[in-house]
């Protein structure tokens, strides 16, 4: 396993249908269906659409409160056509919560042969991705398996504590896939899920500081709410006795790149020694980087140190980003949004 998680390590496809990369239905095509009379021609054209486009069209009908269109499609499909019924169910999961409208359509499809376990329990996997607890419980009531694909619904729900807790209370394995859940919770800095898992027996010092390293190395560093959650997770782990000495030069460099003083303060207060970074530049055989040379040159020629740092590190970086990417950077060392 990697030294820390990336988004690709825990993001799973929400359904088999999402693996179909056929093009989305165009707005012109949606308009055409929207204006059509509900008749056999409508159904013939609907059946010709790829499955992904069928789901998208049904989703648009739901968003536009065109329930009659959905009812017409359901009532005019071949009895027990599990694939089409499943596609409509996936659209319902995305656009609705359990209410009278959902119940009416759901029961109508059940009466026509809807199988909530179709395609290896695709529906509950889809609902878990969207963390729709009311729909999840409805699917379980009609036979959906929460343990499908090695407790995939549990793994998909790490982002939302209420749904995650529901699966655990109903027998899902918190240690599945080499303690995947607590690793993903650390990547997301989900304090509630991480604390819950540790209280249920997960090791806070798994793989010699893996959780601490993952939080520090996480790509998700911007936004006041996330920063607060991240530091809360760090404080909790340090409070449990996880040692900061598991953080190496790689992690410390990442902390500095994040340009977040709150993160730096939490680490420093818990024993992290950033002076170890000096060893990166102690080898006299390694030539000084261009920026250091430029700073020394400008200071020796009368530019004060603060102005030099702002010019070289901030303004010139903006110039390079404009030149390469056509836009300025969102964050610079001299203008940190969350300190």
From Swiss-Prot:
<keyword id="KW-0040">ANK repeat</keyword>
<dbReference type="InterPro" id="IPR002110">
    <property type="entry name" value="Ankyrin_rpt"/>
</dbReference>
<feature type="repeat" description="ANK 4">
    <location>
        <begin position="275"/>
        <end position="307"/>
    </location>
</feature>
<protein>
    <recommendedName>
        <fullName>Putative ankyrin repeat protein L120</fullName>
    </recommendedName>
</protein>
<feature type="repeat" description="ANK 2">
    <location>
        <begin position="147"/>
        <end position="176"/>
    </location>
</feature>
<keyword id="KW-0677">Repeat</keyword>
<dbReference type="InterPro" id="IPR036770">
    <property type="entry name" value="Ankyrin_rpt-contain_sf"/>
</dbReference>
<dbReference type="Pfam" id="PF00023">
    <property type="entry name" value="Ank"/>
</dbReference>
<feature type="repeat" description="ANK 1">
    <location>
        <begin position="119"/>
        <end position="146"/>
    </location>
</feature>
<feature type="repeat" description="ANK 3">
    <location>
        <begin position="178"/>
        <end position="206"/>
    </location>
</feature>
